[in-house]
Design a protein with these regions (language model features):
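A conserved regulatory-domain signal marking ACT and ACT-like small-molecule sensing domains
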Residues: 1-90
Length: 90
């Protein structure tokens, strides 16, 4: 399974989750886990996804999510799970 981690941070507004989830569904990216909080008007979300079925290259998805974030006024980052695994190896 090709897992990725998506983080979304910015000022809270209506439709952030809907727009991100619609993009993922349209690209055959399955959400495995999601956590979302709002702290003093600021939106923060972390998602873990399975990207096995998507036809797009990882770099394209990263770029498109960043552009989507700009459109809706948040910062969206997409990283491969391996990065986090490597950070915790000694």
């Amino acid at each position: 399974m090709k897992k990725t981690i998506i983080t979304v941070v910015g000022k809270d507004t209506v439709g952030i989750i809907a727009r991100v989830c619609t993009y993922l569904a349209d690209n055959q990216i399955n959400i495995l886990d999601i956590s979302q909080t709002i702290v003093q008007g600021f939106f923060n979300m972390m998602m873990i996804e399975d990207m096995n079925l998507t036809k797009k290259d990882f770099g394209v998805i990263v770029d498109e999510l960043a552009k989507l974030g700009e459109e809706i006024g948040v910062v969206i980052k997409c990283q491969k799970e391996e990065i986090f695994d490597q950070m915790h190896r000694i």
